[in-house]
Amino acid sequence: MTFKIALLAACTALSTPALAEEVFPATLAGHAFLPALSLVAPPADAPRDLWISGKFTGPTRNEAPMSVMGNVGKSYGGHETGIALPFIGQPVQGMSGFAMNRAEDGSWFALTDNGFGSKANSPDAMLFFHRMAPDFATGTVTRKETIFLHDPDHKVPFRIANEGTDSRYLTGADFDPESLQSLDGTFWIGEEFGPYLLHVARDGAILDVIPTRLDGAVLAGPDTPGVKVPAEAGKDYQVQRSGGYEGMALQPGTNLLWAMLEKPLLVAGGGTEGDFLRVMTFDPAKKDWTGESFKFRLSEGATAIGDFNFIDATHALVIERDNGEGDAAKACAAGATDTSACYPIPAKVKNIVLLDTASVDAEGYLRRIGHIDLLNIADPEGKALAGMKPAAGPFTFPFFTIEDVARVDDTHILVANDNNLPFSGGREVGKAANNEFILLSVPELLSAK
């Protein structure tokens, strides 16, 4: 019995850091949204093919606009989303990263991802980022500008989908942009197919494409050009599919980019190296990796990250998440066969973590100070918009992919979701998710040390 008690005490002591991480309160201070079906016209010099997007999301080409209803997929209940594709124009959907530095007018630079989720189904999805301005007084979001990525100087080192065109606009068959930073009048984008860092001019022209290096070796994924199929996971490539730079933070003072992979690296045999994510630092001035790398440990139940941004010289915010979607209050009963009105995989882990990047342990792990729970947000003043809140209990943000976070001021942060149009819901069964922007009052989180 004494041995068992001693062993239990030892195990408890070893597990205390994970269990003792402080959970800080969050209060809703503002709520706004961009409607799910928000489209933008391609530039006048874009190929005609790009005026209809989503033609290749099914097994065969489909050129009939709005003819196939979006669906969240069998695992998530098989719910239709009420929005059909192909689209006439390009969907603004998929907010996948905020730049820390805002535009001169105070609007936010926000990135749209590769389009429809994969290299194969997104050759007609244009790549772009925007200036977005949420108005929490009216509950609306204004798209003030869209910048389209293009490669006029042939900087991309492989054949692009629009190789034979004069305008050379980039598409989701070329890159999967997931993180964004603004520095010295240009932009840096972290993407997932390489994974690569893209240096981009203010007008969207590609200036450079830089491969990833960890411990001196180039990292590749299954979608990296040059990786031959069949390829062995952990040997021929180490980065998981959709596991590239979901988060890339710009460090004030040093201007270093801290690039964080979305998912754990693969090892020989196809398994992962652990419940942690790699973080590498890159010097934009030298256009080279510094050689330093760190580890971010995921909490129990988390499978990936959504965004990563500094709030001062050493402290940063990271969104960590599970693969769930929808409020737990609407979860399907265990063993349910009828999932038409419930969520089979409800959201359970949606956190924003505060990191101390100046505190690193002997194994290279960055110190987690604490987090807020996006499934438990107080709303005492009723800021939540009608139809976008639970019937009872606290306000929640129960989306599959929450991919935007940035510091607004000393007490507030801005958070937004990637709505994966037209393939994700989360608020209401059978309805596509909007692009929601929430302003959160989190003074305790932002001041914690």
Regions found by a protein language model. Name each.
Residues 21-449:
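Sequence/structural signature of beta-propeller domains
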